[in-house]
């Protein structure tokens, strides 16, 4: 007798049995917003990167659990804050900067390897006797604070003159067997966020900063090929925990301001 239902036969979940459609990846077409309400820090909020897809999964065999969702990693980061002619502070990912790894996980720090565990993932517990249809979505943006004053100084005198940030990410849509850790890559997306802000610290609060360069971000690329996931993109630490804030003065040795967690 042939196999009638995959819940009773050990039918394997394969890529050709998974349907992915309506894949969408965009960055909002609005400029980065600058906030100058605090006498201590400048804040800026970038537009959102958004990704979504509809998925049809085949019936899940007994004793198997599959999670379908988004995994994201940072591939490159430059984040410099210049303070007049004194030097600059720099958020850095040392392993990435020195080429020891190709990517660092951008998980929420709880749901490894997934970007998050709300709209970002769907869990399917076998046995299921019919196909499953669902959507998964995620979004990401930057909303940091940068001190007006030199971060290693006791002074509150505003000296910030420039903020430059350039960060690249890879985002994967993945189906994963939670027991065997088998991964089926369903989609690969590349995107980049750039920020360039010029600051005149001599101006009054609320009139110091302005956006320079491009006002809109380039749109994400949905790749036609599936790019493999580097091992470091799946495990701790994530980018937030791995990053270190350095002070790099024009004269003298660099200092660690905030070490990695």
UniProtKB/Swiss-Prot annotation:
It comes from the Eukaryota. Belongs to the FAM78 family. This is Protein FAM78B.
């Amino acid at each position: 007798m042939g196999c009638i239902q995959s819940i009773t036969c050990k039918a394997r979940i394969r890529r050709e049995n998974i349907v992915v459609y309506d894949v969408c990846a965009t960055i909002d077409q609005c400029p980065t917003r600058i906030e100058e309400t605090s006498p201590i820090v400048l804040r800026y909020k970038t537009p959102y990167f958004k990704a979504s897809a509809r998925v049809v999964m085949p019936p899940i065999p007994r004793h198997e659990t599959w999670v379908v969702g988004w995994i994201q990693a940072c591939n490159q980061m430059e984040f410099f804050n210049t303070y007049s002619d004194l030097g600059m502070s720099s958020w850095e990912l040392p392993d990435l900067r020195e080429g020891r790894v190709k990517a660092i996980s951008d998980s929420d720090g709880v749901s490894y390897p997934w970007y998050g565990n709300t709209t970002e993932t769907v869990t399917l517990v076998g046995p299921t006797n019919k196909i499953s249809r669902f959507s998964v979505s995620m979004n990401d943006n930057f909303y940091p604070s940068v001190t007006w004053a030199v971060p290693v100084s006791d002074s509150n005198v505003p000296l910030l003159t420039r903020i430059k940030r350039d960060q690249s990410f890879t985002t994967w849509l993945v189906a994963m067997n939670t027991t065997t850790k088998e991964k089926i890559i369903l989609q690969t997306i590349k995107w980049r966020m750039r920020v360039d802000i010029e600051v005149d610290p001599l101006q009054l609060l609320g009139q110091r900063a302005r956006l320079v360069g491009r006002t809109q971000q380039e749109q994400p690329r949905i790749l036609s090929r599936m790019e493999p996931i580097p091992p470091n993109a799946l495990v701790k630490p994530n980018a937030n925990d791995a990053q270190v804030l350095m002070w790099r003065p024009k004269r003298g040795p660099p200092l660690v301001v905030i070490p990695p967690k």
